[in-house]
Amino acid sequence: MRVFIADDDWTELTAGTAPAVRFSAPDLQQAQRMRRGLAGAAILDVTVVVDADFRAAQQQLSSAGVDSTLSYGGTLDGLAGLLVDIYLAGVADGVTLIPAVPQQDARALAEAVSARVAQRLRTAA
């Protein structure tokens, strides 16, 4: 699974080789429909807030006023589960993590969740 972050550039933290196509959708069902029409590796935007406390993350996400992109507010383990589901269900080949709040460090978050995703994918294989 490929992982990118939305920073000044669009930065990949994994080692993908196929050309990537970034896209956004309001939900997983719409994302799966959109993915069918894309050539190359489909990389889905996911706006995120991660906190050790699920309720705190949900409140921050609600306050952030996320637009029409798929969003997640919760724990790091929950985010890893969502990303694995996105990949295994064929919704996307990877994701772009977009912090919903400025205090969220996109790179640190992506590195932490990537390790958990890799572990879950090894277990699923």
Where does each model-flagged region fall?
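C-terminal amphipathic alpha-helical "assembly" element
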Residues: 1-125
